[in-house]
């Protein structure tokens, strides 16, 4: 997959973003990227607590009782997961070269996350048949394989949406109310839980920007704080 152009990061700030507002911003950026009105862009943010159900979510994956946060059906792949404070969510809105290779793109996101957590001393890995980034089982500590980052994407008209979520210092009990990503035989973890010290979203922003730009082959990258100012959409 050849290089993308300059990658523009928008850090939406420390206040958690309601999911529907973030999703609408993705859609507005997506149609402008398809029309070449904006550059390749990545939204970096934290969400208010929310469960998002991808297209493969079954009724058995959903909360059986009131989970304490909205459950929203969305147009990405995958099953159900949680987003909320203490979790870095990244939404690349990037034009991929033809022919599209969705698997290669997902592997790039996984590689970026593996490099990010590697900077903090953790050895991330892939698990065959499962997306996301994992930590190996630790039988001596009584720990199964643990998922530290979830990935779910949508590609339409050659441009990506949705992306990945990396657990930093979020409350992991939110995942107890669902079958996260449809996987029953593994755990969920965070940087803070693994390192036994607080690692917040702000602590991993620079590493995330650097490694994601590198795996996407961006010629350069820069960060803008705040929500993007969108040009008026012109439908070609």
Swiss-Prot record:
Pfam families: LplA-B_cat. In the reaction, the free carboxyl group of octanoic acid is attached via an amide linkage to the epsilon-amino group of a specific lysine residue of lipoyl domains of lipoate-dependent enzymes. It catalyses: octanoyl-[ACP] + L-lysyl-[protein] = N(6)-octanoyl-L-lysyl-[protein] + holo-[ACP] + H(+). Pathway: Protein modification; protein lipoylation via endogenous pathway; protein N(6)-(lipoyl)lysine from octanoyl-[acyl-carrier-protein]: step 1/2. Its EC number is 2.3.1.181. Belongs to the LipB family. Signal peptide: none annotated. One of its GO terms (biological process) is protein modification process. InterPro entries: aa-tRNA-synth_II/BPL/LPL, BPL_LPL_catalytic, Octanoyltransferase, Octanoyltransferase_CS. The keyword Acyltransferase applies. Coiled coil: none annotated. This is Octanoyltransferase. It is found in: Cytoplasm. The record marks 147 as: Lowers pKa of active site Cys. GO terms for cellular component: cytoplasm. Catalyzes the transfer of endogenously produced octanoic acid from octanoyl-acyl-carrier-protein onto the lipoyl domains of lipoate-dependent enzymes. Lipoyl-ACP can also act as a substrate although octanoyl-ACP is likely to be the physiological substrate. The active site is at 181 (acyl-thioester intermediate). The keyword rRNA-binding does not apply. Keywords: Acyltransferase, Cytoplasm, Transferase. GO terms for molecular function: lipoyl(octanoyl) transferase activity. Its main location: cytoplasm. Substrate binds at residues 76-83, 150-152, 163-165. Residues 36-220 form the BPL/LPL catalytic domain.
